[in-house]
């Protein structure tokens, strides 16, 4: 983990010392960190206590390494997880990236279920990128080259099956987020990956 991620993790560890356990949790990478869930929920009359433990740039290996401060220490009754977008890359595992992701999803669910017996688990589907925005550069397109609709369809099919196998839930909100070519709608994103509040 880089220094920025380490700092966020340290802050979460401090916050977990005073957290009210047994509440609702959203956790994962940037799409969770940038999710203004508490504000949106309050605007809809939802007064539940909701915690956010997302860290931008986090991958699944890092999430598993720090699963206690990011999830288990809070002992949530409901947990919503969106992690793995940063694993859609050939950098570390080559053409085995999808296999590695699915193995990690199983590990995450197994660790939660082994410790939090009554927690309801919701896996949130991966959202496609938009590689056709005017702001895209050769470097950004290269970085996102695997984040195409076909790969997201593959990346979401197996987790849905895994979730069912483990008695968990799978949430796919992409129908309202994608355009005619199954890329992220331009009005919802500022860089082709991360979302404006209107998308949430």
Regions found by a protein language model. Name each.
Residues 71-72, 109, 113-114, 163:
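N-terminal cationic-hydrophobic initiation segments that often serve targeting/anchoring roles
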Residues 51, 122, 169-171:
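General small-molecule cofactor/ligand-binding pocket signal
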Residues 116-121:
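A short helix->loop->beta-strand "cap" motif at the edges of active sites that frequently abuts
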Residues 128-200:
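Catalytic His-Asp segment of secreted/periplasmic serine-dependent ester chemistry enzymes
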Residues 82, 124-125:
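Alpha/beta-hydrolase-fold catalytic nucleophile elbow
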Residues 28, 54-56, 125, 174-177:
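Residues at the C-termini of beta-strands that transition into short coil/loop
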Residues 2-103:
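Conserved SGNH/GDSL esterase-like catalytic core that processes O-acyl groups on lipids
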Residues 105-110, 156:
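Generic structural signal for well-ordered alpha-helices
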């Amino acid at each position: 983990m880089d220094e920025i991620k380490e700092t966020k993790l340290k802050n979460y560890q401090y916050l977990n010392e005073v957290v009210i356990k047994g509440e609702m949790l959203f956790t994962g990478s940037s799409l969770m960190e940038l999710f203004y869930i508490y504000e949106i929920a309050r605007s809809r009359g939802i007064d539940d206590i909701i915690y956010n433990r997302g860290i931008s740039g986090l991958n699944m290996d890092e999430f598993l390494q720090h699963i206690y401060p990011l999830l288990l220490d809070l002992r949530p009754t409901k947990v919503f997880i969106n992690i793995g977008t940063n694993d859609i890359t050939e950098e570390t595992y080559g053409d085995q990236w999808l296999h590695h992701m699915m193995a990690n999803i199983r590990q995450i669910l197994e660790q939660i279920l082994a410790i939090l017996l009554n927690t309801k688990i919701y896996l949130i589907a991966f959202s496609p990128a938009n590689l056709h925005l005017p702001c895209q550069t050769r470097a950004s397109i290269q970085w996102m080259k695997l984040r195409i609709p076909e790969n997201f369809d593959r990346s979401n099919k197996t987790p849905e099956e895994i979730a069912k196998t483990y008695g968990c839930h799978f949430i796919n909100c992409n129908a309202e987020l994608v355009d005619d070519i199954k890329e992220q709608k331009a009005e919802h994103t500022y860089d082709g990956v991360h979302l404006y509040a209107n998308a949430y």
